[in-house]
């Protein structure tokens, strides 16, 4: 997390990319708790992931999904969802599946 940075003076639009926030009910009810990014069809994406052998379920899922076509990126606010046991991968997949359903895209593209 960046420390000591001031607010951006201008946030320039990026063609083929949209960014938004939403309440998914992951945190407190009504709180904006996810960031949703839409990539235009045919976009190329890249990711930089931890090299740590122990990482959160959403990171593991993202590494797999980045091998195919990515249309949406989904991140939760706050701390990582690490150390969640078997429930972690299931919750990560379920959250992506719901966004895919709402967006009308393949689950593997989220």
Predicted regions and their residues:
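N-terminal amphipathic/basic leader segments beginning at the initiator methionine
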Residues: 1-49
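Fold-independent oxyanion-binding glycine-rich loops
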Residues: 39-41, 62-64, 76-79
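Glycine-rich oxoanion-binding loops at beta->alpha junctions
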Residues: 45-67
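Alpha-helical support elements that line or immediately flank enzyme active sites
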Residues: 77-104
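Flexible, glycine/charged-enriched surface loops at secondary-structure junctions
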Residues: 105-109
């Amino acid at each position: 997390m960046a420390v000591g940075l001031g607010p951006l003076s201008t946030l320039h639009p990026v063609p083929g990319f949209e960014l938004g926030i939403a309440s998914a009910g992951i945190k407190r009810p009504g709180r904006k708790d996810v960031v949703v990014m839409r990539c235009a069809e045919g976009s190329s994406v890249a990711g930089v992931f931890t090299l740590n052998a122990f990482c959160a379920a959403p990171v593991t899922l993202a590494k797999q999904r980045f091998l195919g076509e990515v249309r949406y990126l989904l991140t939760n606010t706050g701390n990582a969802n690490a150390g969640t046991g078997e429930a972690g991968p299931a919750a990560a997949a379920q959250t992506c599946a719901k966004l895919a359903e709402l967006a009308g895209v393949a689950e593997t593209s989220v």
